[in-house]
From Swiss-Prot:
Residues 331-340 have a biased composition (Acidic residues). InterPro entries: AAA+_ATPase (IPR003593), DNA_recomb/repair_RecA (IPR013765), DNA_recomb/repair_RecA_CS (IPR020584), P-loop_NTPase (IPR027417), RecA-like_C (IPR049261), RecA-like_N (IPR049428), RecA_ATP-bd (IPR020588), RecA_C_sf (IPR023400). This is Protein RecA. It comes from Staphylococcus epidermidis (strain ATCC 35984 / DSM 28319 / BCRC 17069 / CCUG 31568 / BM 3577 / RP62A). ATP binds at residues 65-72. PANTHER family: MITOCHONDRIAL DNA REPAIR PROTEIN RECA HOMOLOG-RELATED, RECA. Keywords: ATP-binding, Cytoplasm, DNA damage, DNA recombination, DNA repair, DNA-binding, Nucleotide-binding, SOS response. Can catalyze the hydrolysis of ATP in the presence of single-stranded DNA, the ATP-dependent uptake of single-stranded DNA by duplex DNA, and the ATP-dependent hybridization of homologous single-stranded DNAs. It interacts with LexA causing its activation and leading to its autocatalytic cleavage. The gene is recA. Belongs to the RecA family. Disulfide bonds: none annotated.
Length: 349
């Protein structure tokens, strides 16, 4: 570029920075050293499927699936992990159905979890926005999008038609939230339900409520589905759950994580260590027997789970080896380890 054009460009950039602040315009290469920072999902299997060691910070995540598939459980594990690393979490309970006893069993510090049970959708999203803009909250979970009922619908009569109200509400909210989420480095998780499209003869009839906006603004979309029931004798004690990454802007999509969600306990950490350990040649499996470093741990997966619960040192050793092999870090992964812990944006110098 010749000198005259460069001078003109420099003048324009100076004027922009004077009007909008330093860093309003930058060269992309100035931040080429930065990588996506993440916070652990609380499951090494899900962290591996996400490709960046967890949920990306400063991004919108959608977790959707059928009823009782484990969506809230997956989100609560993420909250527990953030709190374990000294972070602050907020939960917008639009469904008014959060069980504090179950949340505590999953490792959530309920005494330090900020909870809101809004009266209508606008209130819930405004509270979420306030948490995000504060810059002091590390993770915000909205449960669920389908329960964010517009105020006009709540105040109206039963049977009144309100076409597209919720979709417009979500579209407006996400337009306001997306920039604030990025600048505050907050992880925003929206839980969503599934609906059936009427009259679909071919293709997938399933869709998610709230319009298309959330699909577009989400950097990661996870589909959670029950694969099979887990039994001990005649008793059903949990579900084998498939978590598919159907959209991923920060790593390759379409990876699948399979985890055991046990009733009253959440994701079985021991179960995923066994599965991933066998897959990555850290745990040896011969028939129904499982071994580690030549020592037998037990026959059958349930017995090995109990063995790992009783031997936490071996459990931690397998976990450490797995994370090293898969390149996953335990806890928060920061863009720059030498930087302070204050919220960062691309515009920070």
């Amino acid at each position: 570029m010749d000198n005259e054009r460069q001078k003109a460009l420099d003048t324009v950039i100076k004027n922009m920075e004077k009007s909008f602040g330093k860093g309003a315009v930058m060269k992309l290469g100035d931040n080429k050293g930065r990588r996506v920072s993440s916070t652990s999902s609380g499951s090494v299997t899900v962290d591996n499927a996400l490709g960046v060691g967890g949920y990306p910070k400063g991004r919108i995540i959608e977790i959707y699936g059928p009823e009782s598939s484990g969506k809230t459980t997956v989100a609560l594990h993420a909250i527990a992990e953030v709190q374990k690393n000294g972070g602050v979490a907020a939960f917008i309970d639009a469904e008014h159905a959060l069980d504090p006893v179950y949340a505590q069993a999953l490792g959530v510090d309920i005494d330090n979890l900020y909870l809101s049970q809004p009266d209508h959708g606008e209130q819930g999203l405004e509270i979420a926005e306030a948490f995000v803009r504060s810059g002091a909250v590390d993770i915000v979970v909205v449960d669920s999008v389908a329960a964010l009922t517009p105020k006009a619908e709540i105040e109206g009569e039963m049977g009144d038609t309100h076409v597209g109200l919720q979709a417009r509400l979500m579209s407006q909210a996400l337009r306001k939230l997306s920039g604030a989420i990025s600048k505050s480095n907050t992880t925003a998780i929206f839980i969503n339900q599934i609906r059936e499209k009427v009259g679909v003869m071919f293709g997938n009839p399933e869709t998610t409520p709230g319009g298309r906006a959330l699909k577009f603004y989400s950097s990661v979309r996870l589909e959670v589905r029950r694969a099979e029931q887990l039994k001990q004798g005649q008793d059903i004690v949990g579900n084998r759950t498939k978590i598919k990454v159907v959209k991923n802007k920060v790593a390759p999509p379409f990876r699948v994580a399979e985890v055991d969600i046990m009733y009253g306990q959440g994701i079985s950490k021991e179960g995923e260590l066994i599965d991933l350990g066998v897959e990555n040649d850290i745990v040896d499996k011969s028939g129904a027997w499982y071994s580690y470093n030549g020592d037998r741990m037990g026959q059958g997966k349930e017995n090995v789970k109990n063995y790992l619960k009783e031997n936490p040192q071996i459990k931690e050793e397998i976990d450490r080896k797995l994370r090293e092999k898969l390149g996953i870090f335990d806890g928060d992964v920061d863009e720059n380890e030498n930087e302070d812990d204050s919220p960062k944006t691309l515009f920070d110098e």
